[in-house]
């Protein structure tokens, strides 16, 4: 990509992610002047390659599975874009906080937890807005299970051929018109379990969460964390410490 005329932001909680630092290093050597960093702690390697670095207020997370920092990163960029349009999301944050707390603490049906804990593969289906993709990654780190993200209506376009009855598909805010097709293809056809994260009841088991309007993605993400935490606890897993995954997956070194 030719980024010569772009303002470039590099986000790295640790401030030592190799890909981000390598990119800023290349752009600096090419004379690029508009380079900005976003990290979760002060005095990082990334900051030395950026013209200015912003630091999240949530603090550094020790757990391998980053959660609150993921949300604050997204909020930072959403507010930045809003301000460029002469707007702001700051007034919506108190209500968003309440909605997230409810999504994190709502009781999960034990049968839902049991089904997901026993799944061979946990799939997330929905819009490509980052929520399903992020939860698929967190599934690996928190539950030690295989996962995948099925974008849009991918779930009803052939993947059922390789699915198993012990798999679970978590559908995030599905369109009502899609529910019967999902049931026909995956529940009736494969015999697997579908769970929904939604602002309204559906024909499937799941959790109903508050409607946060344009900030709904954060509530969806929190609801997914809630489910994964319950599954991890039920499996006796140390939620904060993965057996193989590292806090900084691909760390920059000077060697």
Model-inferred region functions:
Residues 50, 175, 185, 191-255:
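Phosphate-moiety recognition in structured ligand-binding domains
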Residues 52-168, 236-255:
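Active-site phosphate/pyrophosphate-binding segments
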Residues 1-101, 160, 168-210:
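Glycine-rich phosphate-binding loops that contact phosphosugars or nucleotide phosphates
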């Amino acid at each position: 990509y030719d980024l010569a005329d772009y303002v470039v932001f590099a986000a790295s909680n640790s401030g030592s992610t190799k890909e981000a630092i390598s990119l800023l290093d290349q752009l600096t050597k090419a004379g690029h002047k508009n380079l900005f960093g976003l990290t979760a702690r002060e005095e990082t390697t990334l900051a030395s390659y950026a013209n200015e670095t912003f630091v999240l207020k949530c603090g550094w997370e020790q757990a391998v599975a980053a959660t609150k920092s993921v949300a604050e990163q997204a909020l930072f960029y959403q507010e930045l874009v809003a301000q460029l349009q002469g707007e702001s999301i700051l007034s919506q944050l108190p209500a968003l906080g309440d909605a997230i707390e409810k999504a994190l603490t709502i009781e999960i049906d034990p049968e839902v937890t049991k089904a997901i804990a026993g799944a061979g593969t946990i799939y997330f289906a929905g819009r490509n807005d980052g929520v399903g993709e992020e939860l698929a990654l967190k599934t690996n780190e928190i539950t030690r299970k295989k996962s995948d993200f099925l974008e849009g209506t991918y779930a009803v376009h052939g993947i059922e051929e390789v699915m198993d009855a012990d798999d679970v598909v978590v559908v995030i805010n599905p369109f009502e018109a899609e529910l019967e097709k999902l049931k026909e293809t995956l529940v009736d056809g494969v015999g697997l379990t579908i769970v929904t994260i939604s602002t309204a009841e559906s024909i499937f088991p799941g959790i109903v969460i508050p409607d946060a309007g344009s900030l709904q993605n954060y509530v969806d993400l929190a609801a997914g964390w809630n489910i994964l935490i319950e599954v991890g606890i039920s499996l006796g897993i140390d939620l904060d410490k993965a057996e193989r995954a590292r806090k900084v997956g691909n760390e920059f070194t000077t060697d």
